[in-house]
Structures are given as structure tokens and as C-alpha cells.
Amino acid sequence: MTKKIIFTGGGTAGHVTLNLILIPKFIKDGWEVHYIGDDNGIEHQEIKKSGLDVTFHAIATGKLRRYFSWQNLLDAFKVGFGVMQSLFIIARLRPKALFSKGGFVSVPPVIAARLLGVPAFIHESDLSMGLANRIAYRFATTMYTTFEQEQTLVKLKHVGAVTKVTAPKSRSVASKQLAAVSEYFDPNLKTLLFIGGSAGARVFNRFITDHPELKEDFNIINISGDPSLNELSRHLYRVDYVTDLYQPLMEMADLVVTRGGSNTLFELLAMRKLQLIIPLGKEASRGDQLENAHYFTTRGYAEQLLEQELTLPHFQEKVREVFAKQSDYLSAMTSSSELQSPESFYQLLSADISSATKEN
């Protein structure tokens, strides 16, 4: 009988990336792979775009809120209906395991898996659990964490950051793929790369537009998320979205200015890139990026600048500070043991699935 596994997770790219790394490994080992998600979510888009042999199952999903809202009543029904749909899907497929990367859409499948006796493994990328994973943890077999957790919960297993990004061996790849960009850049200037999520990038976009004098001191790469800003000119390259050029652009940069999303932070750690973190504040998030940024700064991996302090003088001061302490940051990143390869995590997950299946 063919072994089956169900993946779930979505809402943002960060809740899909690890799944897309793991799925090909399961397929290669003969597993039949299914995915439960939102038909209109980024997870469905990414699965279709990947071309992987995955069967997608759409369920109803509702947003979980920590505050009172009449919308909670409607969304509670959506979540309940999502659980019923997930029960039907899982009962029909009879998978050996379910793996969840989080997000609101993942809660119903995890609950359904527990009710049907299917081992459910979940992954938490942030220093503190989001509401969806707080709920899912109660129904999970194991929760893998990227960060060392202060909580001593029995089902937690710290694995570090799972990333396929590695430190560059040379810049030859970047120079070949980005020859056109290099023609507009001054080799005597440091190169800064700005990257943020869909919402987080807007502050960077506006900052670069409002301060054209940045181009006098630096080459600027701006991954903007906005195609109307695309531009290649003297000391400036603005592009809305990159895939194959992502790592070459990173390698081209001397310093990366980023938000506080854990996936990007750990990718930069894996590449040993100098980074200045400008996290989303609590007015735009639940505060997880502030926690992630604090974790990185206290370990000497990066420097932080709060968004409300993002003025040109403050920014220039922080950039100078990072470059002045470059050797300290690189030493801390080089000695870090917080990274794990996709293959090693796959082996760990496979072993845990086998163990949980035997127990059942």
C-alpha cells in the first residue's frame, strides 16, 4: 500500500516554504502527497506553481483573533466547517501522518488528525507561538521549533532553522547572472539590499524614494513587491519579485536591510550576511518580529533599528555601526549552530513519523 502524507499551512509565504522543501523528498521516497489549504490562499498558488505531484484539497478557513469582534462568530463557524471537511478528507485518505507549517488554515486539519488518530507534526518558526499554533499544539504529536524556547512544554523539539540556503563559495554566480545590474553599480561603494514582506516592504520603498541621496553613498537593491517601481539606473536596482536571482542578489549585497521574519533572518544567517533588522512593530503584527530581532541582536548576529527611528541620520549611523563591527558579526554567525539542512530535518521527521506510527 502506498504511504500517504498530508501537508497543511498557509496564509503567508513563510507558512508554505518549508512544506515546498520537504514535499519533493517525500515524493522521491515513494510517498503519495496531499495538501489541505485555502483554495484562494498563497499555498494553493505555490503548489500549482511548483509543478509537484501533489493533490490539493480546499477547506473553509476563518481568521483567529485574540480580541473581540463580531467577525469571530462567523469565522468560528468557518473553522468548525473546516474541521468537518478535514475529517472527511483524512478519513478517506487514511494517511500515515500530517505535517503542518502553521497559519489559520492549518488548525482544522490538525484537530481532525488528532480526532482520527493520525500523528500530527507541526513547525513553529517564531520565538513565540502564534495563536494558530498555540491551538494546534494541544492536538499535535510533536512541535518542532526554530528558536530555543523558554517554555518547557513536553511536545517541543528544538531543531533550529531548516534552510537550503548556504554561505556563498564565490560571487561568480552572481556576477554572471547580474552583469546588467553590475554595469550600473560603483564597485567602490558598498551595496545595500532592502527586502521586506508584502506589507513590510512599503516602508523601505518609501524610504528609498524619499532619500535619493542614499545612492551617493551606496549601491541600492530594493526588492519592493511593487512592479510599478521597477527601475535600473545609476546605483539603483528596484525589482518587485525574484526567484532564481534571490540568492545571487543576496550574495551581491554587503549588507541586507530586512524585516524581522524568521525565515529571512535565518537565511541571512546561513549566508553569513551582515544584516540590519527593522522589525514590524506591534501596531502591524503580534510583536513576533520584535522578539525575533531581539533574539538575533542579543546573539550578536545583527543590529536592530526600530521603525519609528527610521530617519536618514539614524539609518546611516546604524549602517556605519554594522560595518565597523563586521568581524564580530561574521564571527558570531560562523560559530552559530542554529541551522539544519533540509535533508537532516527530513530524516528526523521520517524517524518521528515511523516511531509515532508504531505506537499507534
Curated annotation (Swiss-Prot):
Its record classes its membrane topology as:
Peripheral membrane protein
HAMAP family under this entry?
A: MurG
| Functional note | Cell wall formation. Catalyzes the transfer of a GlcNAc subunit on undecaprenyl-pyrophosphoryl-MurNAc-pentapeptide (lipid intermediate I) to form undecaprenyl-pyrophosphoryl-MurNAc-(pentapeptide)GlcNAc (lipid intermediate II).
Cellular location of this protein? Answer: Cell membrane
Protein name, per record: UDP-N-acetylglucosamine--N-acetylmuramyl-(pentapeptide) pyrophosphoryl-undecaprenol N-acetylglucosamine transferase
Glycosyltransferase is among the record's keywords:
yes
**Is Transferase found in the keyword set?**
yes
Q: Which organism is it from?
A: Streptococcus equi subsp. zooepidemicus (strain MGCS10565)
The text of the family note is: Belongs to the glycosyltransferase 28 family. MurG subfamily.
User: GO molecular function, one example?
Assistant: undecaprenyldiphospho-muramoylpentapeptide beta-N-acetylglucosaminyltransferase activity
